[in-house]
Amino acid sequence: MQRDQIALPFQWPVADRDEDFLVSDANRDAFTHFTRWSLWPVMATLLTGPRKSGRSLLAQIFVRKTNGRVLDHVEDRDEEELFHAWNDAQARRRPLVMIGDRPPPAWKIRLPDLASRLAATPQVAIDEPDDELIAQLIVKLLADRGIAAPPDLPEFLVPRIERSYVAIQHVVDTLDRDILANRKRMSLAAARHALQEAGLIRRAQRRA
């Protein structure tokens, strides 16, 4: 008897093009903030938002255009490192993008000079995804893996999955594995079955 084939995940290319960052009301303020960087009071900004929200992608697109620098996970970095990076950005006139889960004072800063510089630094946040962005991301992330989403799939999933970027990623990963394992074209029925088995969808809920 032939053993069931194990679906092995492929390493998909990392998105880094302008069109890879999808804009909706959930992230429009952040997107606009970076297009108007010449108006920043200092050559630095703090970008916060949930993990998997595209915050690193937006920052990388920006620094590629401006010859800037990105520092991710700033809450966990040495304060002296942040202090010198901020000063260096001003001296070189190269914008610094600091990325974190939350803005200060949610993470305690002991170095007074760093605290004063961050207080003068503009901050912008990406919110949890809205319905429009959830639908766009499902279609795009599946397309990035060579999978055509059925036209009715986004509308079905939007009210049934958790409203978070991590949940969207789990949904796409699950559908990708199901397609690889079963070697068949995706349908709404097959997607619903795979996601129900994984515990990723619930009864449709009315969005506020």
Where are the model-predicted features located?
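Dynamic helix-loop-helix/coil hinge segments at AAA+ ATPase domain boundaries and subdomain interfaces
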Residues: I6-R28
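Short regulatory helix/loop adjacent to the ATP-binding pocket of P-loop NTPases
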Residues: P104-A119
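C-terminal helical "lid" of AAA+/P-loop NTPase domains
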Residues: E155-P159, V166-L180
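Pre-Walker A adenine-sensing motif
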Residues: N27-L39
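Conserved C-terminal helix/linker of AAA+ ATPases
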Residues: I179-E197
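Walker A/P-loop nucleotide-binding motif
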Residues: V42-L58
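Conserved AAA+ ATPase "SRH/arginine-finger" region at the nucleotide-binding site
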Residues: T121-L133
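Conserved P-loop NTPase "ATPase switch" module shared by AAA+ and STAND
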Residues: K65-E81, A85-D88, R92-P103
